[in-house]
From Swiss-Prot:
Annotated GO biological process: axon guidance; regulation of transcription by RNA polymerase II
Placement of sequence motif Cell attachment site: 500-502
SUPFAM superfamilies: EGF/Laminin, TIMP-like
Signal sequence annotation: 1-27
Known tissue expression: Spinal cord.
Organism classification: Eukaryota, Metazoa, Chordata, Craniata, Vertebrata
Purpose of the protein: Netrins control guidance of CNS commissural axons and peripheral motor axons.
Name of the protein this chain belongs to: Netrin-3
Domain spans labelled Laminin EGF-like: 255-308, 311-371, 374-421
Domain Laminin N-terminal, residue spans: 36-254
SS bond partners: C92-C125, C255-C264, C257-C274, C276-C285, C288-C308, C311-C320, C313-C338, C341-C350, C353-C371, C374-C386, C376-C393, C395-C404, C407-C421, C441-C514, C460-C577
Localization, UniProt: Secreted, Extracellular space, Extracellular matrix
């Protein structure tokens, strides 16, 4: 963005030169050749040109011989102050003939919107006043603040000392009192005020909010308070009746757009507004557009565009909000949070699929169909959510498939919605093949009854403690019955280490025939017993696996035991079994 455009313009020629068009502007002043945003400002214009001037006094009502408001040839209306003709017009605005003091007349120019002022000038058609005050408003005329004063007697008119030659003594700009305009040889005079004269040297507009506020105005007012007199400045009776006359009121400035626009336009209602760029909006480009709030709004400078950034929502949201805490945590890079993510997405950036959907790896994240429904089977799946990456639904025991829609190998469909797939049954031993008859069962085993507490001493006496799931009915193998099992967890193992995975549980045939232990397919059990079996071809046809013989304990599994067994396992590893 160009540096601060100071210019103290003292003659009509220099005023015209400042407002004349310069070299051709680039195609898009708000972006460089590569399309990157950069700070930009509208050109310097006469903000008062063609604007209505509100004068507190104008001659012609009632009509006189020299001034008649109803006759265009003899009218001296305030419109002559800002007409496009400027100094070329032979007519001047003229106040009424003021018969007595105070001889105050005000000229107010509403600019239509906020401008950043550079200068104010006014040409007088008669001897210039000896006392003039310049005021500005930032709220369209509701309140006023002084810009500067011009007087031949600053202390008398405004109670101020004359302006020092090197500008304000303080750190910021202030309204100073300058010498009154001098009369020209032709009897006219020129009031020329530069905003630079009221500001300390070296103050940069880009980095000084105080200076930005100082030069901002929506209205400018010129107050003519005392005509020029040859004698005592307090003796107004010597000049009455008196009439002020002036023309060519100029307010040089730039449309205030905070560095985010290179021009101002009229909206549909005829109001002057900035043609905002960089994702900004508003009459002065003073805020970010609704979806451009990934970082807070800032005024553009010559070094940094501070463009408002669109929220990163991957095309799945139309609204977002700014979160300062997230912005700080990101190193002041991003603070946007997407709202109402569409297309089954979720997250701050709509970057993952919502519950019940998963990412389609064959589509881009910005694709409207990037998230596919899990479509988990209502009976075979244990829930409606699936893995966000693979789409795999959580299946019930014995169920398989991406959507849990079929039974796993070795399982068959049941009529139960709780357990839709059960283990395919394997024929067990018959009475003819069993060496023990039911009436002999009491001599073989007594099933465990009631509650059972697992103490450290009992835990340490067993060669192994494992959780198993029975896969099918037992199969007779000589003096033994073999049950296919899956070892789900190992809490203690013997010399030949028990391992998780598929295995076999060997039960003496006599005990198995009496239902001791009673092992049902699809159920889980806690097995506390002897060590791992011998190699294949062992006694009585027993193969490798686990043994549930006399001295072993088989209990229906309870989930509450897991924590207790893990605690006993840790105590064993610390050597507590030796003490027990």
């Amino acid at each position: 963005m160009p540096g601060w455009p100071w210019g103290l313009l003292l003659t009509a020629g220099t005023l015209f030169a400042a407002l004349s068009p310069g070299p051709p502007a680039p195609a898009d002043p708000c972006h460089d050749e590569g399309g990157a945003p950069r700070g930009c400002v509208p050109g310097l214009v006469n903000a008062a040109l063609g604007r209505e001037v509100l004068a507190s006094s104008t001659c012609g009502r009632p009509a006189t011989r020299a001034c008649d408001a109803s006759d265009p040839r003899r009218a001296h209306s305030p419109a002559l102050l800002t007409s496009p003709g400027g100094t070329a017009s032979p007519l001047c605005w003229r106040s009424e003939s003021l018969p007595r003091a105070p001889l105050n007349v005000t000229l107010t120019v509403p600019l239509g919107k906020a401008f950043e002022l550079v200068f104010v000038s006014l040409r007088f058609c008669s001897a210039p006043p000896a006392s003039v005050a310049l005021l500005k408003s930032q709220d369209h005329g509701r309140s006023w603040a002084p810009l500067g004063f011009f007087s031949s007697h600053c202390d008398l008119d405004y109670g101020r000392l004359p302006a020092p030659a090197n500008g304000p003594a303080g750190p910021g700009p202030e309204a100073l009192c300058f010498p009154a305009p001098l009369a020209q040889p032709d009897g006219s005079g020129l009031l020329a005020f530069s905003m630079q004269d009221s500001s300390p040297p070296g103050l940069d507009l880009d980095s000084s909010p105080v200076l930005q506020d100082w030069v901002t105005a929506t209205d400018v007012r010129v107050v003519l308070t005392r005509p020029s007199t040859a004698g005592d400045p307090r003796d107004m009776e010597a000049v009455v009746p008196y009439s002020y006359a002036a023309t060519d009121l100029q307010v040089g400035g730039r449309c205030k757009c905070n560095g985010h626009a290179s021009r101002c336009l009229l909206d549909t209602q005829g109001h002057l507004i900035c043609d905002c760029r960089h994702g900004t909006e508003g009459p002065d480009c003073g805020r970010c557009k609704p979806f451009y709030c990934d970082r807070p709004w800032q005024r553009a400078t010559a070094r940094e565009s501070h463009a408002c950034l669109a929220c990163s929502c991957n095309g799945h949201a139309r609204r977002c909000r700014f979160n300062m805490e997230l912005y700080r945590l990101s190193g002041r890079r991003s603070g946007g949070v997407c709202l109402n993510c569409r297309h089954n997405t979720a997250g701050r950036h709509c970057h993952y699929c919502r519950e019940g959907f998963y990412r389609d790896p064959g589509r881009a994240l910005s694709d409207r169909r990037a998230c596919r429904a899990c479509d988990c089977h209502p009976v075979g799946a244990a829930g409606k959510t699936c893995n966000q990456t693979t789409g795999q639904c959580p299946c019930k025991d014995g169920v398989t498939g991406l959507t849990c829609n079929r039974c796993a190998p070795g399982f068959q469909q049941s009529r139960s919605p709780v357990a839709p797939c059960v283990k395919t049954p394997i024929p067990g031993p018959t009475e003819d093949s069993s060496p023990v008859q039911p009436q002999d069962c009491d001599s073989h085993c007594k099933p465990a009854r009631g509650s059972y507490r697992i103490s450290l001493k009992k835990f340490c006496k067993k060669d192994y403690a494992v959780q198993v799931a029975v896969g099918a009915r037992g199969e007779a193998r000589g003096a033994w019955t073999r049950f296919p099992v899956a070892v789900l967890a190992v809490f203690r193992s013997g010399e030949e280490r028990a391992r998780r995975g598929s295995s076999a549980l060997w039960v003496p045939a006599g005990d198995a025939a009496c239902g001791c232990p009673r092992l049902l397919p699809g159920r889980r059990y806690l097995l506390l017993g002897g060590g791992p079996g011998a190699a294949a071809g062992g006694a009585g046809g027993r193969g490798p696996g686990l043994i549930a013989a006399r001295g072993s304990l088989v209990l229906p599994w309870r989930d509450a035991w897991t924590r207790r067994l893990r605690r006993l396992q840790r105590r064993e590893r610390r050597g507590r079994c030796s003490a027990a």
